[in-house]
């Protein structure tokens, strides 16, 4: 964390990849109290997927990358995410945020299923594109707030990060970052 200017992180490995690992991660400037990664149900012929969860003093951040092959597999992955979050944080008063690449458009069955237990915080209208960074034409990346424990926060602002002072997003990722500014 010191080498990264005070940032800490946790990485959830989904699979080996080109001599390293492929998965999801969370970076934070706050002290991580606890963390865990769980394997999600795997769609037939698809890559392994995981949910990585980081608990901080005032809130919880979870991240995932859902299956890109099958909406049926995505439904099973959403069910598992909901089960894990309910089991671990159902009795907590901390807000639980879930972000990631859901490989699902706003009008998809997967997003409809998520909206039963989660509130989408990031822009997701007809022109709010997050993929691809080379030629954005669809919204598949979101940050959500879990409704299951009644925890509240105020959304101060949201943004799809199209402009940067430094760096080239088109070279850094095939996705455009999304941002939510919240107040507790």
Features from the language model and the residues they span:
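Metal-dependent phosphoester-hydrolase catalytic domains
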Residues: 72, 86-97, 103-184
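Generic enzyme active-site microenvironment
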Residues: 63, 98-99
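N-terminal, active-site-proximal structural segment of metallo-dependent hydrolase catalytic domains
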Residues: 1-4, 16-20, 79-83, 174, ...
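Active-site beta-loop-alpha substructure in enzyme catalytic cores
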Residues: 61, 69-87
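Extracytoplasmic/periplasmic, Sec-exported soluble proteins
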Residues: 19, 43-46, 69-73, 102, ...
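Extracytoplasmic/secreted envelope proteins and their assembly/folding machinery
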Residues: 1, 24, 78, 82, ...
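Structured beta-strand-rich core segments of catalytic domains in phosphoester-bond hydrolases
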Residues: 1-59, 66, 155-160
């Amino acid at each position: 964390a010191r080498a990264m200017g005070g940032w800490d992180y946790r990485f959830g490995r989904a699979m080996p990849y080109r001599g390293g690992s492929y998965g999801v991660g969370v970076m934070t400037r706050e002290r991580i109290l606890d963390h865990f990664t769980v394997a999600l149900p795997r769609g037939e012929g698809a890559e392994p997927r995981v949910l990585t969860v980081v608990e901080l003093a005032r809130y919880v951040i979870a991240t995932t990358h859902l299956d890109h092959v099958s909406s049926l597999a995505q439904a099973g992955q959403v069910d598992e995410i909901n089960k894990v979050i309910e089991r671990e944080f159902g009795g907590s008063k901390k807000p639980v945020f879930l972000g990631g690449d859901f490989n699902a458009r706003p009008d998809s069955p997967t997003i409809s299923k998520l909206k039963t237990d989660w509130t989408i915080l990031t822009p997701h209208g007809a022109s709010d594109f997050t993929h691809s960074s080379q030629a954005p034409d669809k919204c598949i990346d979101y940050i959500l707030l879990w409704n299951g424990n009644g925890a509240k926060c105020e959304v101060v602002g949201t943004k799809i990060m199209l402009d940067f002072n430094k760096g080239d997003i088109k070279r850094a990722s095939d996705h455009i970052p999304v941002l939510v500014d919240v107040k507790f």
